[in-house]
Amino acid sequence: MAISKGAINVRSIFIGGEEPCICAPVVGVDAEQVLAETRQISAKKPHLIEWRADFFNGIHDDRQVVATAKEIRTIAGDIPILFTVRSEREGGRPIPLTEEEKMRLFETVCQSGAIDLLDYELVHEPYVATVRQLSRQYGVRLILSYHNFDFTPAKEELVAKMRQAGKYGADIAKVAVMPKSLQDVLVLLQATEEARQELPIPLITMSMGGLGAITRLAGGLFGSAVTFAVGQQSSAPGQIPIEEVKDVLSVIMKYSQ
């Protein structure tokens, strides 16, 4: 059974197809670290690599970002690259860019041909249409995301966030929340299943931290098309090493058909 109603093809992979994809983050602070991490992660063959550019100390320099993105592209080969500049309010590093400056950076990076997917946060609603337009212009898939590192909102609110992402033209909707109890974990999974039944786009969902670890392993059964795993360094609480995620997913998918 397909994870999503509407799987999308990105290079050599299908997101939302028969099996969940594994995405490994790159969080180096300079080009040397970023490229070293990319080499190490690429050797582990994840389905996707996410460059968390908010960790990059050259984020203010478009030319440096593009040059590094192109080198990541070369090293990664046919592995799709997700470009993310996470805001501080949603768990990222502080960066010296306004939203207007981010728009310029996104257009430059998308135009370079070095990336395949772009993550942007729903909270920046006035800029979502601009990001949607430029991502389409350059053939880059758009993930519209919502992160809450404080608590897990009600199921209805989580479904509404994913619905909002779809309404704004996202290719993929993403929700990541922090649980305070196992009940919160169940809320996230229930929201994922409900949104999967309703929306025609792939979903990425997770409950963070140790309590939510099960969602990173079994989330695909409920409709989460991508799980984030540690390739070299973690970018969020509760991420599990890629080798262990691969082992567990292979067992789950084998016996859940």
UniProtKB/Swiss-Prot annotation:
Pathway named in the protein's UniProt entry: Metabolic intermediate biosynthesis; chorismate biosynthesis; chorismate from D-erythrose 4-phosphate and phosphoenolpyruvate: step 3/7
Molecular function GO terms recorded: 3-dehydroquinate dehydratase activity
Broad enzyme group: lyase
EC number(s) reported in the record: 4.2.1.10
Keyword Amino-acid biosynthesis: yes
Residues annotated as catalytic: H147 (proton donor/acceptor), K174 (schiff-base intermediate with substrate)
CDD domains recorded: DHQase_I
Alphabetized UniProt keyword annotations: Amino-acid biosynthesis, Aromatic amino acid biosynthesis, Lyase, Schiff base
SUPFAM superfamilies in the cross-refs: Aldolase
Listed Gene3D superfamilies: Aldolase class I
Swiss-Prot/TrEMBL GO biological process terms: 3,4-dihydroxybenzoate biosynthetic process; amino acid biosynthetic process; aromatic amino acid family biosynthetic process; chorismate biosynthetic process
Superkingdom, natural source: Bacteria
Positions that bind 3-dehydroquinate: E50, W51, R52, R86, R216, S235, Q239
Catalytic activity: 3-dehydroquinate = 3-dehydroshikimate + H2O
Biological function: Involved in the third step of the chorismate pathway, which leads to the biosynthesis of aromatic amino acids. Catalyzes the cis-dehydration of 3-dehydroquinate (DHQ) and introduces the first double bond of the aromatic ring to yield 3-dehydroshikimate.
Assembly: Homodimer.
Family to which the UniProt record says this protein belongs: Belongs to the type-I 3-dehydroquinase family.
Protein name, entry field: 3-dehydroquinate dehydratase
Organism: Geobacillus thermodenitrificans (strain NG80-2)
Recorded name of the encoding gene: aroD
